[in-house]
């Protein structure tokens, strides 16, 4: 059930209904071993100035942690979204009100959305089993995606192959799909999805994109020209341990699952673990933080695997890392406000890409450098790519702008993937036509 964006009220369950729902949710979570988020809300705060932003940043340092920022405090012009556990709602709302921080309720009860999501997945799974098919309009588990990859590669072995580039902390295979028409060391394009495990729309978009490539090769002139001259690599599940955990225990888990002696909290933010700007602004040295950068650059096997693979290949010309949510297309730098040397070219290309995206379903995206469009973030994928000589480095933030956040309904998978494809196609075509 959604809270009204303007901060008003909407009809809710009666006390008896709510008690019944709570009991049902707790039983369901216990049976499935999954965390329960009944009563948790997502609040949106729009800070007026830097002072109010500072007050919001103070919430991240509370011990024990009381909020989970979905969109962190960045600048006064950008909303801050945070999940607040039911047990902390009274405290957090009082804190906001006492400091004059106006808020609205974006999601009134997270568990309601989670139950709807789980029910939709179960329904889709039953249909897939009865028809022996794979639904591109549904969310899937790691095991289902792995099975799909094997079948997909077998069915399209003339153009697709599977490469294992490493193993995760929990020893899961890190797999990449390679799309190629033959030859060795072609110029290449890298696409990764799901580096933050709770961003399920990114995995689903990647899967749809992979199928789109094989479906349109030989029919779409632009794509055909790209694949005749270049290879495309897609890593669908960049954070396999975290992704598996979002299905088995905590749907809202962001980091990987690495464990270190003497540290109570688990996991590293894989998008803060890269060498470029490691440990700088927009990352955190606190292992309990959602943006914990890890003990050292590329300490995480999931990051090291990509670095080693791309470096050994030596001929990648574009890298696109796909995240959610906020509807943005961005380029380096994230670590500072310093413009990159080809800033104008990247700006114009991003503009063309979001215009192509808009034409599909009328969805508007912001675009620009990461540090000026979203926030300063150090140790991130695209900064590393650019500093490693990959000229066309971009990061997407897919749908939506906060109504559902990381819990985007499966009904939006296909539209999201369709529009994202047109932006990807634009970037890849430009990369093809501007060799370096």
Curated annotation (Swiss-Prot):
Binds 1 zinc ion per subunit. Its main location: secreted. It comes from the Eukaryota. Its cofactor is Zn(2+). It is found in: Secreted. GO terms for cellular component: extracellular space. Substrate binds at residues 196-199, 254, 271-272, 324-325, 375. Residues 138-431 form the Peptidase M14 domain. Zn(2+) binds at residues 196, 199, 323. InterPro entries: CPA_M14_CPD, M14A-like_propep, M14A_act_pep, Peptidase_M14. GO terms for molecular function: metallocarboxypeptidase activity; zinc ion binding. Transmembrane segments: none annotated. The keyword 4Fe-4S does not apply. Gene3D superfamilies: Metallocarboxypeptidase-like, Zn peptidases. Residues 34-126 form a propeptide. Keywords: Carboxypeptidase, Cleavage on pair of basic residues, Disulfide bond, Hydrolase, Metal-binding, Metalloprotease, Protease, Secreted, Signal, Zinc, Zymogen. One of its GO terms (biological process) is proteolysis. PANTHER family: CARBOXYPEPTIDASE A5, PROTEASE FAMILY M14 CARBOXYPEPTIDASE A,B. This is Carboxypeptidase A5. It comes from Macaca fascicularis (Crab-eating macaque).
